[in-house]
């Protein structure tokens, strides 16, 4: 792979991993239009590591808070001491919600992955992009109300995790579906976006660990295209994530819907020719 190809794929990965337009849907469409074969596993894993790093940096304060809170909670459990502050209580609850949401994601995601070769057809991708667009469009009616972490129930976390598992289907945007689900379930905008991206961390790590098993059984080669692609995915992904969080908080999440409708329609047309 040429270095410029690595950069281009890094840009696509960085943008579509976080913006609610479906990274898998774009991958299938680009491969079909340009006759590109699936990227080497090591290159694909490297791109995802770049976008994962972007999430870790953007949400480093939340991750640090949860780590400290869980640590203090463990000490308190054995020492019979209650958590020290409201911040500890919030960190413990947020960590628990992520665990609850990750369980259905893992079960449903792993189940669908066993038959994912059946899903990568252009008509299906087009139809799922239309579904994504519809979900995004419906969020325009969500006002600024809703609950934060304090009112966030485990049931809500479970259903958002289910939605994330379904995002294995190409054309369904993970961020779009989970943020929309959070809004529909009564979360406020900031909490819906915050939980969506925190919930994606164990999902990405789990998927990459599974890929690493195959990776180490093959031949991995670090070249310039891989390095540039990973760095590009990180930089572009960081910027895309910051922009998307601001858009969600401003109540303009639905603005991505027309793009999904147009791309979904074009994909359906190409797939059924």
Swiss-Prot record:
* Entry's localization field: Cell inner membrane
Q: Which GO terms describe its molecular function?
A: undecaprenyl-diphosphatase activity
What keywords does the record list, in alphabetical order?
Answer: Antibiotic resistance, Cell inner membrane, Cell membrane, Cell shape, Cell wall biogenesis/degradation, Hydrolase, Membrane, Peptidoglycan synthesis, Transmembrane, Transmembrane helix
Checking InterPro entries in the record gives: UppP
Class of this enzyme? hydrolase
Source taxon at top rank: Bacteria
The note filed under miscellaneous reads: Bacitracin is thought to be involved in the inhibition of peptidoglycan synthesis by sequestering undecaprenyl diphosphate, thereby reducing the pool of lipid carrier available.
* Family to which this protein belongs: Belongs to the UppP family.
What is this protein called in UniProt? Undecaprenyl-diphosphatase
| Gene encoding the protein | uppP
